[in-house]
Design a protein with these regions (language model features):
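Charged, glycine-rich active-site and insertion segments that engage polyanionic ligands
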Residues: 1-50, 71, 141-142, 151-205
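Conserved catalytic/switch belt of AAA+ P-loop NTPases
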Residues: 130-147
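Clamp-loader machinery-focused feature within the broader ASCE/P-loop NTPase space
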Residues: 1-127
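A short beta-strand-to-loop transition that corresponds to the Sensor-1 phosphate-sensing loop
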Residues: 120-121, 147-152
Length: 205
């Protein structure tokens, strides 16, 4: 997993996250809204890693070396929970109750926060959203919930109103090209083709 310094674009979101971490002014619930490939999971993972870091830098950046960071990088940090679902196109009320509501009452194992990352949050059924809403309305002080979605409008207005909304914008073409040429070592003419195809979405490049 990279650091915030390695993320291409999204500087306003990174600045906001870093300031929140530095000031210890973290909300209980966030929505990261952006199209597929825009970097929602990367930002959520880096945010979670920074919150749990045991030796965080002054700018809010995770150290990447402590036990918590190493666990986060390998996907084994016990207080960073990735919510999954068995059915391909829906997150059921049982998924939310089992993985979030019933688990969130247990205090963090080794960290200050207990963080739940819900990818494809727009796949939650109405029942699942209502179940989650109760937790968002009265969360434990250590809880942080991150909803990742391509369509925030699919979430209940009552959920949206209780979350901090972070919208991932398209990245400038020159930043995409610079990354492709410098980091991926793609030649100029190929980078231009990739940039045209990406349309500001690093995941498509």
């Amino acid at each position: 997993m990279s650091s915030f310094k390695d993320v291409v674009g999204h500087k306003n979101i990174i600045k906001y996250i870093s300031s929140a971490v530095q000031a210890d002014a973290v909300s209980h619930a966030y929505i990261l809204n952006g199209e597929r490939g825009s970097g929602k999971r990367l930002l959520a993972n880096l945010f979670a890693m920074s919150l749990q870091c045991q030796n965080r830098a002054e700018d809010g950046e995770a150290c990447g070396k402590c036990q918590s960071c190493k666990q986060a990088q390998s996907g084994n940090q016990p207080d960073i929970i990735k919510v999954t679902h068995e059915k391909p196109n829906t997150i059921s009320v049982d998924d939310i109750r089992t993985q979030v509501n019933n688990d969130i009452v247990i205090k963090p194992y080794s960290s200050k926060y207990k963080i739940y990352i819900i990818p494809e949050a727009d796949l939650m059924s109405a029942q699942a959203q209502n179940a989650l809403l109760k937790t968002i309305e009265e969360p434990p002080e250590y809880a942080v919930i991150m909803l990742l979605t391509e369509n925030a409008e699919a979430l209940l207005p009552t959920i949206r109103s209780r979350c901090v909304m972070m919208k991932l914008r398209n990245i400038k073409d020159q930043l995409v090209k610079k990354y492709l040429m410098e980091q991926m070592e793609i030649p100029d003419y190929k980078a231009d083709v990739c940039v045209a195809f990406a349309q500001g979405n690093m995941g498509k490049a």
